[in-house]
A protein has these predicted regions:
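C-terminal helix-cap and adjacent tail motif
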Residues: 8-37, 41, 213-243
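Glycine/small-residue-rich phosphate/adenosyl-binding loop
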Residues: 11, 15-18, 88-170
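Generic N-terminal amphipathic, Lys/Arg-enriched alpha-helix
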Residues: 24-31, 44-60
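Small-aliphatic-rich amphipathic alpha-helix that forms the alpha element of a beta-alpha
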Residues: 52, 71-76, 145, 151-202
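Glycine-rich, charged/polar anion/phosphate-binding loops
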Residues: 74-76, 128-133, 199-201, 224
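Glycine-rich phosphate/pyrophosphate-binding beta-alpha loops
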Residues: 76-83
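A glycine-rich helix N-cap at a beta->alpha junction
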Residues: 110-118, 204-227
C-alpha cells in the first residue's frame, strides 16, 4: 500500500518489479557491462569451462577447507522454487568416514556391475569411460561433499513444509558448485552410487533428506588421464526461433 492508496503495477522497467504487493523488496544491484565486455567475459568463461573434466585420480596435496566452503556458498546462490533452498551440503574430510563411504559404495557398485543389477547397455556405455565398481577416489580425494535434496522442509514445531521443484533446484545448485570448483582450479566427479541410502545412514541425515550426488574433490594427480571425448556442437544442442 502507498500513502495514497493501493500500489499500482506498472510495465516492467530496468528498476521496477511487476508485483511487489505483500513482499519485502530491495533495489537490484547487478552490474551491466558493455557488449565488448560481455563478449570477452563470455568467451573467457567458455574457454575455462571447456577445460572441465571429471577426474578420478587425485593428488595427495591438501585442499584448504575454506576453498570448498566458498564453492558451497557459491552453490547456495542458486535459484530455487519459492526460494526454499532445498539443499544440504555435507562436507567430509575425516579419513575414517571416507573409508566407510568407499566400502559401502563399492559394495553397492559391485552388485551393480557383477550381479546383473545394472542393465548391460548402461554398463557398456560407462565401461568405455574407464569406470568400474572400484572407487578408490572416495578415500584418496582430500574432501567429499555429499549433496542432499530436502524433499520437504521441517518447521520448528516438527510440521512439514512443502518444497516446490526441489529436484530441479538441487540440480541447478550442483551445476553451480561444479563450476565454482573448476573456476578455482579444483577437480571433481559426479558420483551417484545406486542405491544411495547408505549415505543417509553414515552421515546421520534426517528422513526429509535424500542423497542427490556425491562429489570427491581435490587437485588432479600429476599424469591424470581422461577419456577422449567430443562435446556436441552448438547446432546439436540449440534450437532457435529467431529474435
Amino acid at each position: 500500500m502507498s500513502a495514497t492508496g493501493p500500489a499500482v503495477c506498472h510495465p516492467v522497467g530496468m528498476t521496477e518489479y511487476p508485483y511487489t504487493d505483500g513482499g519485502d523488496f530491495v533495489p537490484y544491484e547487478g552490474r551491466r557491462f558493455t557488449v565488448p565486455e560481455m563478449r570477452s567475459r563470455a568467451e573467457e568463461y567458455l574457454e575455462l569451462m571447456s577445460q572441465r573434466r571429471s577426474i578420478r585420480t587425485f593428488a595427495d596435496d591438501p585442499v584448504p577447507r575454506e576453498l570448498v566452503e566458498t564453492a558451497i556458498r557459491t552453490a547456495g546462490t542458486a535459484p530455487s522454487g519459492a526460494h526454499q533452498q532445498p539443499w544440504t551440503f555435507v562436507l567430509v574430510g575425516d579419513p575414517a568416514i571416507k573409508k566407510q563411504i568407499r566400502l559401502a559404495a563399492e559394495e553397492e557398485e559391485r552388485t551393480n556391475y557383477l550381479h546383473a543389477r545394472m542393465p548391460d547397455d548402461w554398463k557398456e556405455e560407462i565401461t568405455r569411460l574407464g569406470t568400474s565398481w572400484q572407487k578408490p577416489y572416495l578415500e584418496s580425494a582430500p574432501w567429499l561433499v555429499v549433496l542432499f535434496e530436502q524433499r520437504y522442509g521441517v518447521e520448528s514445531d516438527g510440521s512439514r513444509r512443502k518444497h516446490y521443484y526441489a529436484k530441479e533446484s538441487v540440480g541447478i545448485a550442483a551445476g553451480i558448485f561444479i563450476a565454482a570448483l573448476h573456476n578455482m582450479g579444483l577437480a571433481t566427479l559426479t558420483h551417484t552410487p545406486s542405491p544411495m541410502a547408505f549415505l543417509s545412514r553414515l552421515l546421520d541425515r534426517p528422513g526429509n533428506e535424500r542423497p542427490f550426488v556425491l562429489f570427491p574433490i581435490g587437485f588432479p594427480r600429476e599424469g591424470s588421464v581422461v577419456p577422449r571425448l567430443k562435446r556436441k556442437a552448438i547446432d546439436e544442442i540449440l534450437i532457435e526461433f529467431g529474435g
